[in-house]
């Protein structure tokens, strides 16, 4: 762009949602251009002044600078930058899509010394395409269609840098690449750099100066995440969330998540002004009152629960049975334990979860993370590497906590793998559990005592599972997630062949592929006697190699179903991969989740249309009417009926 105008794309579009780093990419590009021009920061300063006007001025939508005149030596190069294409300031009421279309039309006819950098979300891009169609702007419509295809996740998406038919235009999908993977050119994963930056010791209070002392959950989280194992497990779980959900962590999401894990989220307006360590110190003081046997209150009794919940492992997996509060309180009162700080603290803690308590920015993401990965739901046979020389199955923890909280605590205490706050809370729960086992308490209400005791043991066991699972990445379906991640990140696609074979068996029945002729997509099949099925030879399923030239690697692997014109691509989703793995372990096909059944039905429906129009394929087809023993087949002249292998 600087040394040889016309040799590189000059219309650059960064496409993606908010928080994906589009603005930062523009800033880096300007820095590189400034250096290439020999502008000595004059280009950076000129743009900074335009995008950061003095006083109450508004940030303009488009800023144009004569970059060539600022360089040394001077040359012809003008740069126009749209930092946010959804902005409509000073547009006299015109929508953002019209402004974007006007800018693209102007830039296409501009000389090679004019460059255009634009950050745009997919919604504005689609609206601009609709506007181009309405205007009848053929060239602009073709350009926007090419951009839309190039930044899509389709397996046949063409090159986006540059566009195939528009060498002067380049686009890049900013939401396609994972921040948890190292860049293709080498270096550290952005998410890893972000976490390590937040954990730098120089950015925290000196050791021993925290107002909360050893009771501070945030300083404790920082200390644990500074260890390679804990940090690696956190990043691995965040990556597993991506591969399972199909979503990507944006920069904005990661910044919010790290802030939430290391500084907490305070809901009460009274606590909003407190520093994280100050908030922890206040709760630690309140807990001292409860621990000395003070009168139970919502603040004092639940303090230890809130401190434990603020540790990163419990902030990440935060879900508790929020609806258990009323029945829990009833059992507590029937047993006369409403003066017990631990029992009432448990009730008040669960009740607090009925109100919103997560940061609104990442609340939905945290809910999805807990649903997909919660270590409390991991298989009992899953093994935890607690230390270098100690490894055990979660079943060992479950068995001990099912007998008593104290037995579970004694088993884990000697391994020194729980935090001080966790040991303190579980110790109090163990004392309450022991009290519920005493004849004096059980005699009053044996059923209430049993219910409360079961709940306490389950609570303690879940707490321990989350602590162990988060620090070792022993989460729900961890082996399947690890295998799926390996398949996705395998550049050669070797792991896809085995999966393709299993999907082929799911789509076909024995050696046949069946298409219903009496129903449309989504309708249930009629009774067997009223069915008419077109039966063709089985459709093959093979890995589909996505185009990787001039574009980011596809975040989703695809399979190719069928041959020739009737072939169709299907996405290998986590649900489909998991279903295949579970079928290998003996699960019945009837137990497949609805999402997988819908994907298979959709694939059959998409294949059906081209198949019924493929004359060559229909030569080997037959129609089953009613019983599978009766088929209509094509003969040299007309059709015949075939029954049990005989022809009539």
Regions found by a protein language model. Give the residues of each.
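Extended alpha-helical coiled-coil/bundle linker/stalk regions that scaffold oligomerization
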Residues: 188, 192-518
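Conserved beta-strand position immediately N-terminal to the Walker
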Residues: 12
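Hydrophobic, glycine-enriched assembly/anchoring segments
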Residues: 25-28, 605-648
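C-terminal structured domain segments
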Residues: 428, 462, 466, 523-625
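Short coil/loop residues immediately preceding or within conserved phosphate-binding loops
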Residues: 9
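Extended charged low-complexity segments that act as oligomerization/scaffolding linkers
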Residues: 1-6, 15, 23-233
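Alpha-helical repeat scaffolds in large eukaryotic proteins
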Residues: 34, 101, 105-108, 124, ...
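Walker A (P-loop) phosphate-binding loop of P-loop NTPases
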Residues: 19
């Amino acid at each position: 762009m600087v040394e040889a105008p016309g040799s590189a794309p000059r219309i650059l579009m960064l496409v993606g949602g908010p928080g994906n780093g589009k603005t930062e990419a523009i800033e880096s590009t300007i820095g590189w251009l400034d250096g290439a021009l020999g502008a000595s920061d004059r280009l950076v300063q000129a743009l900074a002044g335009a995008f950061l006007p003095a006083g109450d001025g508004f940030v303009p939508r488009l800023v144009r600078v004569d970059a060539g005149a600022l360089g040394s030596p001077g040359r012809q190069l003008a740069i126009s930058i749209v930092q946010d294409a959804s902005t409509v300031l000073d547009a006299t009421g015109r929508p953002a899509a019209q402004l974007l279309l006007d800018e693209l039309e102007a830039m296409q006819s501009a000389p090679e010394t004019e460059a255009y950098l634009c950050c745009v979300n997919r919604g504005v891009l689609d609206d601009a395409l609709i506007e181009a169609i309405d205007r009848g702007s053929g060239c602009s419509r073709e350009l926007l269609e090419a951009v839309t295809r190039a930044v899509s996740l389709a397996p046949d998406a063409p090159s986006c840098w540059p566009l195939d038919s528009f060498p002067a235009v380049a686009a890049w999908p900013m939401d396609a690449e994972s921040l948890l993977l190292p860049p293709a050119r080498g270096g550290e994963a952005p998410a890893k750099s972000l976490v390590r930056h937040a954990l730098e010791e120089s950015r925290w209070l000196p050791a021993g100066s925290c107002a909360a002392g050893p009771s501070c959950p945030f300083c404790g989280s920082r200390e644990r995440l500074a260890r390679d194992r804990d940090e690696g497990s956190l990043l691995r779980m965040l990556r597993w969330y991506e591969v399972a959900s199909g979503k990507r962590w944006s920069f904005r999401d990661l910044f919010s998540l790290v802030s939430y894990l290391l500084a907490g989220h305070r809901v009460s307006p009274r606590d909003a002004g407190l520093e994280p360590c100050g908030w922890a110190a206040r709760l630690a003081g309140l807990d001292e009152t409860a621990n000395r046997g003070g009168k139970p209150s919502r603040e004092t009794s639940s303090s230890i629960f809130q401190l434990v919940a603020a540790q990163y492992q419990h902030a990440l997996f935060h879900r508790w049975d929020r609806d258990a509060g009323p029945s829990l309180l009833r059992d507590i009162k029937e047993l006369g334990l409403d003066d017990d700080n631990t029992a009432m603290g448990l009730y008040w803690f669960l009740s607090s979860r009925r109100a919103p308590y997560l940061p609104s920015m990442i609340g939905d993401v945290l809910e999805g993370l807990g649903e997909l990965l919660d270590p409390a739901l991991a298989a009992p046979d899953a093994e935890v590497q607690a230390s270098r020389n100690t490894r055990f199955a979660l079943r060992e923890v479950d068995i001990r906590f099912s007998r008593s909280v104290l037995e579970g605590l004694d088993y884990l205490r000697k391994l020194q793998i729980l935090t001080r706050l966790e040991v303190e809370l579980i110790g109090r729960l163990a004392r309450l559990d022991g009290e519920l086992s005493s004849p004096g308490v059980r005699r009053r209400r044996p059923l209430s005592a049993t219910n409360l005791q079961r709940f306490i043991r389950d609570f303690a066991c879940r707490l321990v599972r989350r602590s162990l699972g988060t620090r070792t990445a022993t989460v729900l379906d961890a082996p399947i997630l690890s295998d799926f991640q390996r398949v996705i990140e395998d550049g050669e696609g070797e792991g896809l062949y085995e999966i393709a074979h299993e999907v082929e068996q799911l789509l076909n029945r024995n050696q046949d592929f069946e298409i219903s002729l009496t129903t449309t997509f989504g309708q249930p099949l009629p009774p067997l006697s009223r069915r008419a099925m077109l039966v063709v030879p089985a459709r093959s399923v093979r890995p589909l190699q996505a185009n990787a030239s001039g574009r980011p690697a596809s975040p989703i692997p695809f399979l190719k179903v069928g041959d020739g014109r009737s072939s169709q691509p299907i996405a290998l989703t986590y649900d489909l991969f998991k279903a295949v793995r579970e079928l290998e372990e003996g699960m019945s096909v009837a137990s497949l989740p609805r999402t997988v059944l819908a994907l298979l039905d959709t694939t059959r429906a998409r294949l059906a249309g081209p198949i019924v129009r493929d004359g060559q394929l229909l030569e080997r087809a037959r129609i089953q009417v009613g019983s599978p023993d009766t088929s209509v087949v094509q003969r040299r002249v007309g059709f015949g009926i075939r029954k049990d292998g005989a022809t009539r």
